[in-house]
UniProtKB/Swiss-Prot annotation:
Keywords tagged on the record: ATP-binding, DNA-binding, Isomerase, Magnesium, Metal-binding, Mitochondrion, Nucleotide-binding, Topoisomerase, Transit peptide
Annotated positions binding Mg(2+) 2: D593, D595
Species of the source: Arabidopsis thaliana
Function description: A type II topoisomerase that negatively supercoils closed circular double-stranded DNA in an ATP-dependent manner.
Lineage: Eukaryota, Viridiplantae, Streptophyta, Embryophyta, Tracheophyta
Stored Gene3D superfamilies: 3.30.230.10, 3.40.50.670, Histidine kinase-like ATPase, C-terminal domain
SMART domains (UniProt xref): HATPase_c, TOP2c
Name of the molecule in the record: DNA gyrase subunit B, mitochondrial
InterPro entries to which the protein is assigned, alphabetical: DNA_gyrase_B_C (IPR002288), GyrB (IPR011557), HATPase_C_sf (IPR036890), Ribosomal_Su5_D2-typ_SF (IPR020568), Ribsml_uS5_D2-typ_fold_subgr (IPR014721), Topo_IIA (IPR001241), Topo_IIA-like_dom_sf (IPR013760), Topo_IIA_B (IPR000565)
Length: 732
């Protein structure tokens, strides 16, 4: 199903362990190459050998939700083991290093930006962008312009106050140079001396980290009718701070411009910023800050290919929820409110949809997405459960005294966004993935309770619809209880409780064990014969599994193939806390045919994993195997090709009068076990795509529109995707 290529919500990492001959790789998703560094360990039960590893990343346009190709690439990894030598090394004061200035950032960049791959590269943009948004949150900026330049640099310009340039009393440098070269120097530490009452920056490291990891950085500041400029390289100033008087017509100009070129010594993969990834973050910020207009421009050497977009959403979070629920059937209009309590601001927007069986809850703190939740999310959940139970009983909507709706029941079908702005946010780490302020939980809880109680008492029809939806979830949970208990009772890792078709591996260590989910008995037979039984298990599926996007929990647990997946993989029960150690295999590999049916089955499986146990993606357990499409035989030599480009490259090297044979593999069952092992299952020669969810909101939208019940939405998706199909690549 070619529509799988639309999975913009997934950041796909392609891993290839190669022998001596480099190849072009791709899959049905056909990404372009892009450098990305990684570490590599020897495959289980095999001796180490020199190898390459490729990581590829693929992201798509969020607005159209269509795939765009992202580049990525490889780095040679030494196989030398870093072991202690027999000679004891001395350990004295001579071995104690003192890193000064920005040296710690360059020494351990991952501590500050997460990684030196694509994610860390984009984090540099977010650091500068967040600074501009902090100016907007403070009420001093209304416009932010982001440009992805053709030379690989990025510039961010805002019309805020401009970074101060006067002499700093402590460092005896200009304030501009101070914030660019000194860690933990900034104006966002709170208190009466802070330059911001609310900000996403806390540690004073964002701008200096970007400077440290940039081959070159140019900064311009417009303040008080003056223009100040300075250039840096790898964290050090290479010019003095210059100053000139602005011409009369530009006297009122104010703001800051940062343009940086990421350092190739740090980002050893190809340095290429993805337009769609950055566009997604910008759209998010525009929803969160309705008074700001953010533009994004991607320059190209060909002017006709230059892209430009503006993002401005006056409706704020209410408009954000409407956008997320575009493909769903809402029960009511979006509910939204804003409260200010004890210096903190709480914004909440929420809406229930009749055709959704899970919730989407997004949390933000000072415009920073807290992907791991926090006290603001906890406050919303607790308040929703308590308030709706109270209102249901008060209104007599729930008549049975023994019924108590749980959080899962009341949140079924809910899309909720909560954004808090607090003077002193307590984030966990520099990456700010979770909010820890205990007082925020109480503020959010109280705000949600007051608003919902007042609104729903005035609108009993909406209350009745929400409670009805929750009661249906409650009844479905009761109907599924027996099946859930069956799953629990069979979850013990005994062969007698495992699916009959599962060909297990001999290893009982989940870290080295992997399972291939294959399509049908034919492919299952070849895979069982071709695998390495020591660490590779095979689970054949019978036809297409249930589309759980359109089914409730009771129907899901009754499905035999779903039960086999849950029991065979050790997934546990939906809704319970995910524990990776309970999995039977830490690599779950989807291996289907390279045709429409194979893509459909792959999509159904991804839907199941996302809805049933989303944490599998976060834990890095979900992979997609890529079998070859062609086998090229010339004489006694045979080569495998994974796409048309690979095929073209190989055949173009043959003489014009060469005689060779091309075999097209329609399915895995056509391959001999030895071929399947060599091309698709051998850890040293295979291609795997590792899937992780990079944007939960976008992922939810994609699954809803692609696999949901609304035909009109799916039809529109197909029409949009059709315009991007390369007709030359269709197998007709």
């Amino acid at each position: 199903m070619a529509l799988l290529q639309r999975a913009s919500y997934l950041r796909l990492y392609y891993l290839r362990l190669m022998g001596s001959r480099p190849r072009l790789f791709s899959s049905s998703l056909s990404p372009a190459l892009h450098r990305h560094s990684s570490t590599l360990s020897s495959p289980p039960f095999s001796s180490p050998s020199p190898s390459f590893r490729l990581k590829f990343q693929l992201t798509s346009v969020l607005s159209q939700r269509l795939i765009q190709r992202n580049a990525i690439s490889s780095r040679f990894l030494s196989t030398e083991a870093s072991q202690e030598t027999t000679t004891s090394k001395g350990y004295s004061s001579e071995q104690i290093q003192v890193l000064e200035g920005l040296d710690p950032v360059r020494k351990r960049p991952g501590m500050y930006i997460g990684s030196t791959g694509s994610r860390g590269l984009h984090h540099l943009v977010y650091e500068i962008l967040d600074n501009a948004i902090d100016e907007a949150q403070a009420g001093y900026a209304s416009k932010v312009d982001v440009v992805l330049h053709a030379d690989g640099s990025v510039s961010v310009v805002d019309n805020g106050r401009g970074i101060p340039t006067d002499l700093h009393p402590a460092t005896k440098k200009s304030s501009l140079e101070t914030v660019l070269t000194v860690l933990h120097a900034g104006g966002k530490f709170g208190g009466t001396s802070s330059g911001y009452s609310v900000s996403g920056g806390l540690h004073g490291v964002g701008l200096s980290v970007v400077n440290a990891l940039s081959e070159a950085l140019e900064v311009s500041v417009w303040r008080d009718g003056m223009e100040h400029k300075q250039n840096y390289s790898r964290g050090k100033p290479i010019t003095t701070l210059t100053c000139r008087v602005l011409p009369l017509e530009s006297k009122g100009t104010k703001g800051t411009s940062i343009r940086f070129w990421p350092d190739k010594e740090v980002f050893t993969t190809a340095i290429e910023f993805d337009h769609n990834t950055i566009a997604g973050r910008i759209r998010e910020l525009a929803f969160l800050n309705p008074k700001v207009t953010i533009s994004l421009k991607k320059e190209d050497d060909d002017p006709e290919k230059t892209q430009y977009s503006e993002y401005s959403f006056a409706g704020g979070l209410t408009e954000y929820v409407s956008w997320l629920n575009t493909d769903k059937n809402p029960i009511h209009d979006v509910l939204g409110f804003r409260r200010e309590i004890n210096g903190a601001t709480v914004d909440v927007a929420l809406q229930w949809c009749s055709d959704a069986y899970s919730d989407t809850m997004l949390g933000y703190a000072n415009s920073i997405r807290t992907i791991d939740g926090g006290t603001h999310i906890e406050g919303v959940k607790a308040s929703l459960t308590r308030t709706l139970n109270t209102l249901a009983k008060k209104s007599k909507t729930v008549k049975e005294k023994d019924i108590s709706l749980s959080g899962e029941h009341v949140r079924e079908g809910l899309t909720c966004i909560v954004s808090v702005k607090v003077p002193n946010p307590e984030f966990e780490g520099q990456t700010k993935t979770r909010l820890g302020n205990p007082e925020v939980r109480k503020i959010v809880d109280q705000s949600v309770q007051e608003y919902l109680t007042e609104f729903l008492e005035l609108h009993p029809d909406i209350l009745e619809s929400i409670i009805s939806k929750s009661l249906n979830a409650y009844k479905a949970a009761l109907a599924a209880k027996r099946a859930r208990e069956l799953v629990r009772s069979k979850s013990v890792l005994k062969s007698s409780s495992l699916p009959g078709k599962l060909a297990d591996c001999s290893s009982t260590d989940p870290e080295v064990s992997e399972i291939f989910i294959v399509e049908g008995d034919s492919a299952g037979g070849s895979a069982k014969q071709g695998r390495d039984r020591r660490f590779q298990a095979i689970l054949p599926l019978r036809g297409k599994i249930l589309n759980i996007e359109r089914k409730d929990e009771a129907a899901m647990y009754k499905n035999e193939e779903i039960q086999n997946l849950i029991l065979g993989l050790g997934l546990g029960v939906k809704g319970e806390d995910f524990k990776k150690e309970n999995l039977r295999y830490h690599k779950i590999i989807i291996l289907t045919d390279a045709d429409v049916d194979g893509a459909h089955i792959r999509t159904l499986l991804l839907t199941f994993f996302f809805r049933y146990q989303r944490a599998l993606f976060d834990a890095g357990c979900i992979y997609v195997g890529v079998p070859p499409l062609f086998k090229v035989e010339r004489g006694k030599n045979a080569q495998y090709c994974y796409d048309d480009a690979d095929l073209k490259k190989i055949t173009s090297n043959f003489p014009a009068n060469a005689s060779y044979n091309i075999q097209r593999f329609k399915g895995l069952g056509e391959m001999m076990p030895e071929q399947l092992w060599e091309t698709t299952m051998n850890p040293e020669t295979r291609i795997l795509k590792q899937l992780v969810v990079d944007d939960i909101a976008e992922a939810n939208m994609t699954f809803s529109s692609l696999m949901g019940a609304r035909v009109d939405v799916r039809k529109e998706l197909i029409k949009n995707a059709a315009t991007r199909i390369n007709l030359q690549r269709l197998d007709i």
